[in-house]
């Protein structure tokens, strides 16, 4: 795909200055080191350095033109003869729109659904992809674990890819015949305009609880970032195009603002509260391997069976099914497919049932990505429903991240677990012991607790202490296969460590 520079600039409502060359653009690049002849260089402002500072290097290496910020132009001023465009602020917004236009606005060719919230994004997006594919609609998935579409799969580097490569991926997905797309949209992505140029057919708000306050400063700022998905990126046609969890106070606030532009959903047991929602569940029965009940929607009521564990996963299911019904897919077909959903790696993943032959008397071991106070509480409550004896929890908190949530996670663990093993979880530049001390400040009730900074030993300790009918929840890393220590990233997988610890276990009583 190729376009001319002037055409691209006019498409995003920018004036073309006198004397600016009008080269044909072969591709877009944000890395001056990877420029190929005919590329348009987009100098993005990063966390540590402004990529626009390297515009001259990009031109030397064959870029036909460069687009940079005013700040970058002051450091290395271009002449009027240089093929350089200086963008107004916010630069990231214009670059996202430019990338979308270059790739032919691919999001407008599919039913793209954005999922945002603190917890539940990954499971909800996996559900949407699975259900649409099961109904015969080729689908794409963009998120924390993976980016994939027919005949293509790649490990994700970010929950939401940056705008320029994201638009290229969307075009490839469209070329592969995709009809639906499920995209996790993080608050960072919304703040940094990574989804600029994306037209969302639908959106889901899962919940909002404490996380990323090292970046957003306050819950209000965090909420405003999330809410921008619904205010600025949804297609406008006057009808409902979103599903909002009103059991969450921030969701209730957003739903009130959106009014008839959304469907609300609730799991509240109070029937008067629940039945005010557009989507809700009745006749709920807990089974050993999931739930069954009746799912109520504005388009009808159907029986369902869900293989997902935990009440929070009922909300994920309700929202995934709800947004697809809202977009026109048949409720009965969606629920028929739901029972076959294989789950999500590292999300309430039962290790004993994951290719590991269980001996009589083994404890049940669960690995989950829960890394916020609310997420940990949900995972512990779900795990409690599976235990006939003790609930053991292994967890830590990330270094160089929101310190305020550490004591809150300690408080949650002490409240809901019988035995806690506090350990490391990507300590980065911080001392693991200092992080553990911060966690300990929240453990004020009389709790059985062990401290083991070495995560592999902590997992072994928890499983070694577990008896028959105990449940061990290993929280925080989920699907991740690494541990970040100082400037080093080492291979580490909670699931592998759990299987190893189970294989060494000899005491089953």
From Swiss-Prot:
It catalyses: UDP-N-acetyl-alpha-D-muramoyl-L-alanyl-D-glutamate + meso-2,6-diaminopimelate + ATP = UDP-N-acetyl-alpha-D-muramoyl-L-alanyl-gamma-D-glutamyl-meso-2,6-diaminopimelate + ADP + phosphate + H(+). Pathway: Cell wall biogenesis; peptidoglycan biosynthesis. A motif (Meso-diaminopimelate recognition motif) lies at residues 425-428. ATP binds at residues 117-123. UDP-N-acetyl-alpha-D-muramoyl-L-alanyl-D-glutamate binds at residues 32, 159-160, 186, 192, 194. Meso-2,6-diaminopimelate binds at residues 401, 425-428, 476, 480. It comes from the Bacteria. Keywords: ATP-binding, Cell cycle, Cell division, Cell shape, Cell wall biogenesis/degradation, Cytoplasm, Ligase, Magnesium, Nucleotide-binding, Peptidoglycan synthesis. The modification N6-carboxylysine is found at residue 226. The keyword Cell cycle applies. Catalyzes the addition of meso-diaminopimelic acid to the nucleotide precursor UDP-N-acetylmuramoyl-L-alanyl-D-glutamate (UMAG) in the biosynthesis of bacterial cell-wall peptidoglycan. This is UDP-N-acetylmuramoyl-L-alanyl-D-glutamate--2,6-diaminopimelate ligase. It comes from Prochlorococcus marinus (strain NATL2A). The gene is murE.
